[in-house]
Swiss-Prot record:
Negative results: does not block mKv1.1/KCNA1. Does not inhibit rKv1.2/KCNA2, rKv1.4/KCNA4, rKv1.5/KCNA5, rKv1.6/KCNA6, rKv11.1/KCNH2/ERG1. Shows a very weak inhibition of Kv7.1/KCNQ1 channels (4% at 10 uM). One of its GO terms (cellular component) is extracellular region. Belongs to the short scorpion toxin superfamily. Potassium channel inhibitor family. Alpha-KTx 08 subfamily. This is Potassium channel toxin alpha-KTx 8.2. GO terms for molecular function: ion channel inhibitor activity; potassium channel regulator activity; toxin activity.
Length: 57
């Protein structure tokens, strides 16, 4: 029974860590939000095919 609790605890901790850790590949969906989004990453905003792309400065 303690193994079951250990597995559940590990799964919950993993879920919390994945929720807290931001996905660095996710970019802003629209070009309007692009400058603000890239400013948080200290990068240059570029709009490519209506998608925000943050390029290193």
């Amino acid at each position: 029974m303690s193994r079951l609790y250990a597995i559940i605890l590990i799964a919950l901790v993993f879920n919390v860590v994945m929720t807290i850790t931001p996905d660095m590949k996710v970019e802003a969906a629209t070009c309007e939000d692009c400058p603000e989004h890239c400013a948080t990453q200290n990068a240059r905003a570029k709009c490519d095919n209506d998608k925000c792309v943050c390029e290193p400065k």
